[in-house]
C-alpha cells in the first residue's frame, strides 16, 4: 500500500492504495476513509471542475477500423493518443469517476472520452468503418458533438 499524506495531516490518517497505468490512476480508500472526500492534492491527472478553464476544448478523434489513430488531424500511436487525451481532458476536469459502494476513485480522462467517442460510432459500425468523432470538454463534463463515418 502506498501512503499519500495531505499537507499537514499525519500519514496514518491518509492511507490509500494507489494503482497507476497508462489509462489512469485509481485510489482505494480504507474503511475508515469510506465516504470521505479525497483531498484535491491526491489528484495528478485531473483538475477540479471548479478550477478548469472557462473555455471548452474540442477534440476531433479519428478512427480507423474502430481504433483511434489521430487527434485533431495529428496521427499518433495508441499510447501517444491516450497520453494526449489524458492531458487535454484532465486539464478540463474530465475523467474523475467515483464508486461509492467500493470506495474506489479513478482518474481516467482518456478512458472516459474515448469510451464516449466509441459509443457514438455505434456498436455494429465501429470495427468496420473509419470515422471521426468530435468531443467537447468543459469544466468536468464531456459530450459528443458529432460523429461522421467515412
Predicted regions span which residues?
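Nucleotide-activated chemistry modules centered on ATP-dependent adenylation/adenylyltransferase
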Residues: 1-150
Amino acid at each position: 500500500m502506498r501512503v499519500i499524506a495531505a499537507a499537514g495531516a499525519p500519514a496514518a490518517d491518509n492511507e490509500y492504495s494507489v494503482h497507476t497505468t497508462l489509462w489512469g490512476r485509481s485510489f482505494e480508500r480504507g474503511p475508515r476513509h469510506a465516504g470521505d472526500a479525497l483531498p484535491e492534492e491526491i489528484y495528478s491527472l485531473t483538475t477540479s471542475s471548479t478550477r478548469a478553464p472557462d473555455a471548452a476544448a474540442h477534440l476531433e478523434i479519428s478512427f480507423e477500423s474502430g481504433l483511434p489513430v489521430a487527434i485533431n488531424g495529428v496521427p499518433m500511436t495508441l499510447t501517444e493518443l491516450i497520453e494526449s487525451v489524458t492531458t487535454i481532458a484532465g486539464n478540463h476536469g474530465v475523467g474523475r469517476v467515483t464508486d461509492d459502494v467500493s470506495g474506489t476513485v479513478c482518474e481516467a480522462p482518456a478512458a472516459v472520452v474515448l469510451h464516449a467517442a466509441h459509443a457514438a460510432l455505434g456498436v455494429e459500425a465501429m470495427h468496420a468503418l473509419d470515422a471521426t468523432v468530435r468531443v467537447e470538454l468543459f469544466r468536468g463534463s464531456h459530450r459528443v458533438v458529432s460523429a461522421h463515418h467515412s
